[in-house]
Amino acid sequence: MRKIITALAFVFVAISANAETFEERAAPCLACHGEKGQSETENTPSLGAQQAPYALIQLFMFREKLRVFEPMNEMAKPLTDDDLRTFSDFIAKLPKPAPSADAGDPARMARAQALAQQHRCNSCHNPDFSGKENVPRIANQREDYLAKTLGEYKDNSRHGYDGSMADVMGPVTAEQIADLAYFIARVR
């Protein structure tokens, strides 16, 4: 899988250098992150309706290798500051990801909702988990990506702008991370 993503990164760089329209430049992004902003690629986030300021910062961090994930670092490398703004605005205008058709197990959903309230997820990410400004939209994000990301915050292998996510995730167990990911992926 990693080889495929790396190959796509090189294709993106080649296409971007020769692309004439923005749609042509965005096509490789949508190949992994979903044509309509809803990813079907394992452990790859859906970008639809993501907050533009958040997307801008993430793209900048990838370009500057402040956030390291090689395919994204390679793809962001040739982007100018204007390109970063254009891409982040484009991402924000994609349709928001649809909730899973599976509404989820009611007991597990209630348990995870209580956990989300206990850890004040709704304070930063909004009560509907739509995000705001430089706080990401997490509502209806891919469950596998949510679990992976929350686990990375817990073990400090992923860093945010400050230590708040690591602080929040510190006491959360692996089982609770799975429940939170399950809930947020299905929130209505």
Each language-model region and where it sits:
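Sequence/structural segment immediately N-terminal to covalent heme-attachment motifs in c-type
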Residues: 18-36, 99-127, 142
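Gly/Gly-Pro-rich "capping" loops immediately C-terminal to redox-active cysteine motifs
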Residues: 37-67, 73-79, 113, 117, ...
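Inter-heme linker and motif-flanking segments adjacent to c-type heme-binding CXXCH motifs
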Residues: 38-39, 68, 93-107, 128-136, ...
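C-terminal capping alpha-helices of c-type cytochrome domains
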Residues: 77-99, 144, 170-188
